[in-house]
Amino acid sequence: MPGHPRDRAENPAAGRRRTIWGEGLHRPQRRFEGRGRGHHAAPATRTHDRWTAAQRRRVLPSVRPDYRAPCGREAGCDCHAPRPDQPRRGDRIGSGRRRAFGDSQPSDLRHRNPHGGAVHGHERAKRTTSIRTGERPVKLSILGARVIDPVSGMDQVTDLHVEAGKLTAIGAAPEGFEPTQTIDAAGLVAAPGLVDLNVSLREPGYSRKGSIASETRAAVAGGVTSLCCPPQTKPVLDTSAVAELILDRAREAGFSKVFPVGALSKGLEGEQLAELIALRDAGCVAFGNGLSSFNNTRTLCRALEYAATFDLTVIFNSQDRDLAEGGLAHDGATAAFLGLAGIPETAETVALARDLLLVEQSGVHAHFSQLTSARGAALIAQAQARGLPVTADVALYQLILTDEALIDFSSLYHVQPPLRTRADRDGLCEAVKSGVIQAISSHHQPHERDAKLAPFGATEPGISSVELLLPLAMTLVDDGLLDLPTLIARLSSGPAAALRLPAGKLSAGAPADIVLFDPAASTVAGETWLSKGENCPFIGHCLPGSVRYTLVDGRISYSR
């Protein structure tokens, strides 16, 4: 890598390059060639030729000098892949210039294989992932696993026995039980299948971005056995016909279980109430309007009262439309330095305070999705202390990244609501640890490549991440922010309880939705890629943990 201290002995000229990213890291040359530069889009108007020491201290403290060092996991991984809060390994090669997302590459990192997705060059000849679908539930024994069940509090090494799609016994096998298949799970952790409350399947309407088959297939690779899909489809999920279509195609795909979230208003326009009872009968487990605000607060209040009458769950994505309009990043030092329009913290807290008051008035069971600020988490904690029936979730990347990730105008970090400050990230982590936020979701939003090949403000927001949900979440354990049982609870029983789903537990007679993973192994993100959306900033990173098996209703939907 040009400019790195170890290169200067061989190439004295490399040491003369101006290092502004901290020791050993130089700012890459910017290219303006009359087109978008992918996730390295051209800055709006401001020049960056001079960085003061104060700016470096305030804006760039997260860039680490140990870039491209071995990941240092206890298992002895020497993959030299960066951690998820470091720059991507594939972003700087050869000459040191930044490669645009989607640029053709002569070698390995983004090579597409005939099965779809991206693999390293040395993996082209073989697929490391074996997907078996369409099988009937197997008669299976899982032997010697560390079984963690947050609902019962179990955390011990024991056996699991599965028959006819159900978990028949934990510990000793039932009398006369003869498995047709056994898994030696010594050293593995067996946990309830993960439950993800926010996975955009992109179908119907946006098949260029993803499909129900591709995204549920990616979900089981991340250990997800049950997921909720939001109503932002085309047509909008505001009729029973659309809900039935999604469920039929999910059953045909045969991977994760899908629980649709219906639209609270017709067309998500915030004017007329959708047919909530018909949607519930068609299989919708909750209702929401996404980031689309109601035009009239009285209409929203009536919708909540109606939902409370039938004990329906309403999902809020609290963001004030006027305060957030036109914003691209958190309104702070990074946005000011980059010249990006900001979205203040109050865009969340103002709307959240209003929504909590309406929940208190109506008595509806409410779930607040995609919290981004520490003050927002504090408002949820106060509401729970008052006895309000409210729960909350946070996108996993909000617990890992901050707005400092935008410093190179990478559109891979363009998300809505935006990444916020370190203080917000730390506050959210503390809320997850204490249980105020009881669910962690991927907020999976797959995009085609063209969606990110534009200047930053013209790109579509979102990160494709459901395939990495468990390995990414394991970074919180590696960093000492959560212990493993707490993490499993926030990924399984917590989200299941929030939306009252029949999932997230290991008990005799329960559906055999199980994830088996190796906490001591590592995953290099992108070695295999099953989602249609490759808009993931973590590709090329070394992540702790590796999913070995995912069982859905007793079927092995994924094995590695």
Predicted regions and their residues:
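His/Asp/Glu-enriched, well-ordered alpha-helical/loop segment
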Residues: 337-365, 412, 433-440, 445-520
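Metal-associated gating/positioning segment near the N- to mid-region
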Residues: 185-253
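Histidine/acidic residue-rich metal-binding segments in metalloenzymes
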Residues: 271-440
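C-terminal cap of metal-dependent C-N hydrolases
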Residues: 455, 511-560
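Histidine-rich, glycine-flanked metal-binding segment
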Residues: 138-193
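Glycine-rich phosphate/diphosphate-binding loop of Rossmann-like nucleotide-binding domains
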Residues: 1-41
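Glycine/threonine-rich flexible loop motifs
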Residues: 42-64, 205-207, 293, 297, ...
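Adenosine-phosphate binding glycine-rich loop
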Residues: 76-132
